[in-house]
A protein has these predicted regions:
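Sec-dependent signal peptide recognition
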Residues: 5-10
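Histidine-centered copper-binding motifs that mark active-site loops
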Residues: 23-289, 296-297, 332-374, 445, ...
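Active-site pocket scaffolds in enzymes
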Residues: 70-72, 114-116, 122-127, 131-133, ...
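Short, conserved beta-strand segments of beta-strand-rich sandwich/propeller modules, principally
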Residues: 99, 150-152, 246, 307-309, ...
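Terminal connector regions
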Residues: 111, 158-164, 168, 303-337, ...
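A conserved active-site cap/scaffold subdomain adjacent to cofactor or substrate pockets
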Residues: 242-244, 250-251, 290-319
Length: 479
């Protein structure tokens, strides 16, 4: 169903809870923007390159309070990168030297974590390196060869990541390759998925840390009553009949796992996680866990004037004892509207996209076991002064991640991409690159990772942000 009955309720039955996390904000006037349902999908602006040098990208990002219209008829006090939610896109190429001049104009410490990028620990933006209010910090790194794909950036302060992301701090990263296998003529769309909990007046409902709702959020993860795409409610994407579009989709939600589908169509999956797959896959639906990204080819199907919805189907990620009553609903995210007939619908998708060699497991330096429970890894909560594992550069490790509880835990390793070996002992059918893997309830996933470079301290954690903030995180020290 493509009407508003399948969009999450905007204003009905919203519990108005006081927010102890709220801080006094000095916010500018409301910035005009389309906040009406079914408006054309807007693309986030691209960060302007301030450098005049070849293969150098120099940009400026400020995190600051702002007022935006996200829910129709209301305004919301948010945190925003350069005044936008989502923030501007960092668009770079493999091999680029990147300089980010960051300014923290928030009333609290923050960081910028470049999720999925293979960069030095000092540039990672972990909670070990907070940027205090009023301070500036330069993040400097090189974009690694062979890492073309879709990534994102978001804050990672100690115990406050969930709050700051909920307030609006997230943006996309696109890494391009000179040998992209897809024709440059294919139109490209960026879709940043988020959800939030809004009160009737448009204010963001982030509950008091001592409230019953906060306790439930810490258990389940905080899901919203409004789903947004690029900060818009139920936008529309126009496509011509027979036209193909390349969609880069990012799950920027704190806890919601999306199960993406377009009724009556197969999805042609090009990439999942840290770059393209070895070959395209045809899928009926695609599971996108927190912080994961997917690249799709979508074809305009149907007669001009017809429309279908990109939907998120029901997915039970919850503990049976705390599962919300409405978990099994289908929600429309956007409308795909056929506007005409494509002049050229003969675009050919290559059978092979790029080589993805399997990581060699002949010589494995360490086999580690990480046991995930509620709020803890291996029975411990996060301590920024403690190193949980020590490893060596130029080695390969296998990690077995065991989830002992009744809900999903998306597991993220900073700084390094990895490959899945098997799930509950069943071998993965082919290698591909990830930086976050979903671990379902009462299951185990084995991953293999090669630590070739970049010494330092690296975080690993559950990417349900409420769990991360609760302490479901550890530190790997590489020498």
């Amino acid at each position: 169903m493509s009407d508003m009955r399948r969009v999450l309720p905007l204003l009905a039955a919203v519990v108005c809870l006081a927010s102890a996390s709220a801080v006094p904000l000095r916010v500018p006037p409301v910035r005009e923007r389309a906040a009406r349902p079914h408006a054309a999908l807007a693309q986030p602006p691209v960060l302007a390159n301030l450098s005049g040098l070849a293969h150098t990208v120099e940009v400026s990002i400020t995190a600051a309070p702002a007022r935006l219209s996200l829910v129709p008829g209301t305004t919301s006090e948010v945190f925003a990168y350069n005044g936008h939610v989502p923030g501007p896109t960092l668009d770079v190429h493999e091999g680029d030297h990147v300089i980010v001049h960051f300014r923290n104009a928030l009333p609290e410490p923050t960081t910028v974590h470049w999720h999925g990028l293979h960069i030095p620990a000092g540039a990672d933006g972990s909670p070990l390196d907070p940027v205090m209010p009023g301070q500036r910090h330069d993040y400097v790194f090189d974009v690694a060869p062979g890492t073309a794909g879709t990534y994102w950036y978001h804050p990672h302060p100690d115990r406050r990541a969930g709050y700051q992301v909920a307030m609006g701090l997230f943006g996309a990263i696109v890494v391009r390759s000179p040998d992209d296998p897809l024709p440059a003529s294919i139109p490209e769309k960026l879709l940043v998925l988020s959800d939030n909990r809004f009160r009737a007046d448009g204010s963001i409902d982030f509950p008091d840390s001592q409230s019953a709702q906060a306790e439930m959020d810490a258990e389940n993860g905080r899901e919203g009553n409004v789903l947004l795409v690029n900060g818009q409610l139920a936008p529309t994407v126009d496509i011509q009949a027979g036209e193909m579009q390349r969609w880069r989709i990012i799950n920027a939600s704190a806890a919601r796992i999306y199960r993406l589908a377009i009724p009556g169509q197969q999805l042609l999956e090009l990439g999942h996680g840290a770059g393209l797959l070895g070959k395209p896959l045809r899928m009926q639906d695609i599971l996108l866990a927190n912080s994961q990204r997917v690249e799709l080819l979508v074809r305009g199907a149907g007669a001009p004037g017809s429309a279908v919805a990109l939907q998120t189907l029901p997915y039970d990620r919850y503990d049976p004892h705390t599962r919300p009553a409405d978990w099994n609903q289908t929600h429309d995210l956007l409308s795909l509207r056929v506007t005409g007939v494509a002049r050229d619908s003969s675009v050919r998708v290559p059978d092979s996209l790029r080589p993805v060699p399997a990581i060699d497991t002949t010589h494995v330096a360490e086999h580690r076991v990480l046991v995930l429970t509620q709020g803890m890894i291996n029975g411990k909560m996060m301590d920024l002064t403690r190193v949980d594992f020590t490893g060596r550069l130029h080695t390969t490790e296998i990690w077995e991640i065991e989830n002992l509880v009744g809900m999903d835990h998306p597991f993220h390793l900073h700084g390094f991409r990895f490959q899945v070996l098997d799930r509950d002992g069943v071998p993965e059918p082919f290698p591909y690159w990830l930086d976050t893997v979903n671990v379902p309830p009462h299951s185990s996933v084995r991953i293999v990772v090669r630590f070739e470079d970049f010494a330092g301290k690296w975080m690993y954690h559950c990417h349900i942000l409420d769990h991360e903030d609760m302490g479901m995180m550890g530190i790997l020290q590489l020498h």
